[in-house]
């Protein structure tokens, strides 16, 4: 299967031109696929956070924090590969770099909460968070609820927000950095958003909603 995908990718390059850099971000791809393109003279950059397979790459990027960050990839990458490890290499969208409210100081009072559990949120943690916040009966707190366009519970979540005068519903927003800058607290999942919240200096209640989020969340907590 990997061979078929590699050949298909190679055909694309033959047709459209060979790239100088090939960025690979897929849990099912390992050294076999990557070697095909390194041998063709293409620089390969692998993005990973599982450290569960061998890579044949020139550059490895893992933006997450782990207590064994410097050693967890061991012999999984070539000895001369450039290793970009840790949150200092977090992949942030341009909106975060240009947001004027980056890492603003926040007081102890919580007046605005941001809820975001990723683009799909297959466990529907968003609805559970909304229910918990409504049960608090705090009319002094404003809540921004963000979901991705692929959320299967969109209509239900939008309806729940519409029932609460201080809740605002956002779908597939390009204003995430602005919403984080305005918030006093975030409630959400781990993953990439962890480093976006950290960059914005936003205190967070984090729940792991996928297996690959558990280890990083525990290590950051510790």
Regions found by a protein language model. Give the residues of each.
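A nucleotide-sugar donor-handling region in carbohydrate enzymes
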Residues: 56-124, 150, 155
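Short acidic active-site motifs
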Residues: 5-8, 32, 153-156, 174-178, ...
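Acidic donor-binding loop of glycosyltransferase active sites
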Residues: 181-192
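Generic beta-sheet signal
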Residues: 47-48, 63, 86-87, 146, ...
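Short acidic/histidine-rich motifs immediately flanking catalytic phosphotransfer sites
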Residues: 16-21, 165, 183-185
């Amino acid at each position: 299967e990997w061979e078929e995908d590699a050949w298909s990718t190679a055909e694309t390059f033959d047709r459209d031109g060979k790239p100088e850099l090939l960025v690979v971000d897929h849990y099912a791809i390992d050294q076999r696929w990557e070697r095909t393109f390194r041998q063709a003279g293409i620089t390969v950059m692998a993005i990973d956070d599982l450290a569960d397979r061998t890579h044949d790459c020139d550059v490895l990027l893992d933006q997450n924090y782990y207590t064994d960050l410097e050693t967890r990839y061991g012999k999984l990458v070539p000895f001369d590969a450039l290793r970009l490890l840790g949150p200092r290499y977090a992949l942030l969208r341009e909106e975060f770099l240009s947001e004027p409210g980056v890492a603003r100081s926040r007081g102890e009072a919580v007046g605005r909460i941001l809820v975001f559990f990723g683009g799909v949120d297959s466990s529907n943690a968003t609805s559970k968070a909304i229910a918990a916040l409504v049960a608090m009966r705090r009319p002094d707190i404003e809540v921004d609820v963000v979901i991705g366009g692929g959320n299967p519970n969109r209509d239900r979540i939008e309806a729940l927000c519409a029932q609460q005068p201080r809740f605002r519903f956002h779908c597939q927003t390009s204003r995430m950095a602005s919403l984080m800058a305005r918030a006093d607290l975030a409630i959400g999942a781990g993953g990439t958003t962890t480093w976006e919240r950290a960059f914005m200096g936003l205190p967070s209640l984090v729940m792991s909603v996928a297996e690959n989020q558990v280890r990083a969340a525990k290590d950051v907590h510790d």
